[in-house]
UniProtKB/Swiss-Prot annotation:
Name assigned to this protein: Glycerol kinase
Family membership: Belongs to the FGGY kinase family.
GO biological process: glycerol catabolic process; glycerol metabolic process; glycerol-3-phosphate metabolic process
Positions with a binding annotation for glycerol: 84-85, 136, 246-247
UniProt organism field: Pasteurella multocida (strain Pm70)
GO MF annotation, one: glycerol kinase activity
Swiss-Prot/TrEMBL catalytic activity: glycerol + ATP = sn-glycerol 3-phosphate + ADP + H(+)
Amino acid sequence: MTDKKYIIALDQGTTSSRAVLLDHDANIVEIAQREFTQIYPQAGWVEHNPMEIWATQSSTLNEVVAKAGITADQIAAIGITNQRETTIVWEKETGKPIYNAIVWQCRRTTEITDKLKADGHEDYIRQTTGLVVDPYFSGTKIKWILDNVEGAREQAERGELLFGTVDTWLVWKLTQGRAHVTDYTNASRTMLFNIHTLQWDDNMLAILGIPRAMLPEVRNSSEIYGQTNIGGKGGVRIPVAGMAGDQQAALYGHLCVNAGQAKNTYGTGCFMLMHTGDNAVQSQNGLLTTIACNAKGEPAYALEGSIFMGGASIQWLRDELKIVHDSYDSEYFATRVPDCNGVYVVPAFTGLGAPYWDPYARGAIFGLSRGANRNHIVRATLESIAYQTRDVLEAMQSDSGQTLQALRVDGGATENNFLMQFQADILATKVERPKVKEVTALGAAYLAGLATGFWKDLSELRDKASIEKTFVPDGDEAKRTRRYKGWKKAVKRALEWEKEEE
């Protein structure tokens, strides 16, 4: 039966490009994945080669079709999700990038952000874009390229250069330069976008000296942006029809489309997003206000908090302390003891993110006594991930006035049943782990499938989305309060560790 149709999600991540093929029941049929080079020209700088991003992404697209043994005319649509903030500038005529992609992790624009703060722009940026002033976001990266690549500024003034985040670059390449577009979620990460008027902000463009002609058109996350030919000229034309930044795509993949719904992605770091509906909540607790999708893939709002050390703290146990062989061991050691024996690990190896925002905090282990052993330290490290998640969730609930009914989870560390149960206990909230683990790709596929009528609406998808396991919190309120109080005490002592004392 060859009339069976599929959706492909292109998931362009920080270390690899993937293509995920889904059928009409939202099951994953096939995955193709290719890694690409991380370029570190100097300390704190991170780049990717945009042509290599395209080469790996386009080859996984062809590969996933070949592996599944289907033909191109069986593909109903392509959706895209991408590493956010990463910045590419290329020539309109030739399609040639004028510099490597500057990756979201890259800190080279710290001097530019320091100057923005010194010039008093912080409040305006927070109110207008919903973001904090940080090298993380695209705006200062574009300015750096225009200031540092020979002739770039002049070319930009003449309208010869285009800017895009990775989604924009992929659509431009897929449509052979016919579409220069981005979606609201990706635009909201540039520090150039007014999240209230949903327009590029002329004032921010003036502050950073970026010509408006470089910028892509901003569209909904679920609509047809253009067609791509699979198999070269004369090949089958397939609509490119859905697009969202990775964290927003994951939120959508969890079907969190209403105010008060939230998800946490447990990767190297953790990203927590809470949907706030039509309300752009200004955080009083150092969270970001960002654009997410409503049920139809149109712009809505979310609060976002990031935790720097999630799974990375387990890697530290494995690679530096060498007390576990692999991250799967951590659950085994943690469950050999009934509790942490008073031990707390604060994994502030690179400072602390939301809601503390203290770059001077450093990692520490507190509460050690003679009876403390390897199991206690492993368990305390796992627990630190759950405590940090509670820190962010409390900030979100206080900002939004919403109380969470259940937390949806995804990412590598969610396989750890001990961590998920402890997370539920410490939040006093149900934790729901979905059956399909690739929720980011799922989100991009849903957006593309809804735009092309492959699925008629979100309620059809709700019937297909199944929760593999729900972790229910234990009722011990006194224990929960006591443990969390201990965590707060430990964090307090780790703050400002690196600050020079007078």
